[in-house]
Amino acid sequence: MDAFTAMFPELFPIEEGLEDALVGSLSDTSAASASATHTSPASTDTFDDADILAILADAEHWRGGNTTAHGWCVVA
């Protein structure tokens, strides 16, 4: 398990078929984002900024830009 998967396990469904459920309309995405709670990765002091950006870039590339990783990459 990589560090990004460990920080955001809900982005990596175990069951087949759930991947399509993660990519929905903007309202679906907004509702999911509003209800999600995350501890800030920065608050853990576990990863350097360069490490976090590398993790996000890998996740962005792997998922094709259709997940929360894309938003984190834009913010970063």
Curated annotation (Swiss-Prot):
Lipid linkage positions (S-farnesyl cysteine):
73
Membrane association type: Lipid-anchor
Question: Which Cys-Cys disulphide bridges does the record give?
Answer: none
Residues that make up the propeptide are 74-76
Question: Where is the protein localized?
Answer: Cell membrane
Cellular component annotations (GO), alphabetically ordered: plasma membrane
Query: What keywords sit in the KW lines?
Result: Cell membrane, Lipoprotein, Membrane, Methylation, Pheromone, Prenylation
Positions bearing Cysteine methyl ester: 73
The protein's superkingdom reads Eukaryota
- Single Gene Ontology MF annotation: mating pheromone activity
Q: What does this protein do?
A: Activates B-regulated development.
Protein's name according to its UniProt entry: Mating-type pheromone BBP1(1)
